[in-house]
Amino acid sequence: MKPIDLQAENSTETVGRSLRRRPLARKKLSDMVEEELEQMIRRQEFAQGEQLPSERELMEFFNVGRPSVREALAALKRKGLVQINNGERARVSMPSADTIIGELSGMAKDFLTQPGGITHFEQLRLFFESSLVRYAAEFATDEQVESLSKALEINSQSLSDNALFIRSDVDFHRVLAEIPGNPIFMAIHVALLDWLIAARPKVSDAELYEHNNVSYRQHIAIVDAIRRHDPDEADRALQSHLNSVSATWHAFGQGSKKKK
């Protein structure tokens, strides 16, 4: 390492002021272990799918305690660089779209509990799926349209069972998200619906039944527009559907508050 040439600085006073502005922070042992392991993985000293050394071996190699090793491995897992299963050594992996979106899950659920949080996420879903249906109407293949039709048929068969209908509803929108063939879109779609469904109030089966029938009819309109390759009509049908879903669940939420 090249020594610092103090003459190259304006003065030692400048250096002093600079250090006062940016105090040095001491790194935790676990952070240093994490950084070194990350570099080893990126240099491919450990190949994808290969197991890392055991915790004890890592402790000896880095001369640190077990907590530091475990914290480092947990941090690498959050980055998607390793997978950790109970009773097994950590295995090298590569970040996926699910890993990236999964990191946001806790923050997203906290945000949903804030005033206006659900509305903001519903708007995000509307903007996102609006683009999906327009793309589907323009570019969906016959096979992809057939997949939508099959999802619609399962939707119809599930109308009398609320739990099954919710599952078939999610699957219908998942097929839409699959059409562009982008794994990031799929990860966003799955996460968005998981977050929004988890934030919904509990509603009786009788109240949900009519809502299910309305949603099903709206799904038909979306598929019909996609089959005709009409992106404007597909977008209108999708927006009508999601605005209706939002209004219904907001009404359910207000009703559950009054009952309390």
Curated annotation (Swiss-Prot):
Residues 27-95 form the HTH gntR-type domain. GO terms for molecular function: DNA binding; DNA-binding transcription factor activity. SUPFAM superfamilies: GntR ligand-binding domain-like, Winged helix' DNA-binding domain. It comes from the Bacteria. CDD domains: WHTH_GntR. The keyword Zinc does not apply. Pfam families: FCD, GntR. Keywords: DNA-binding, Repressor, Transcription, Transcription regulation. Residues 55-74 bind DNA. The keyword Iron-sulfur does not apply. Transcriptional repressor that controls expression of the genes required for the catabolism of sialic acids. Belongs to the NanR family. This is HTH-type transcriptional repressor NanR. The lineage of its organism: Bacteria, Pseudomonadati, Pseudomonadota, Gammaproteobacteria, Enterobacterales.
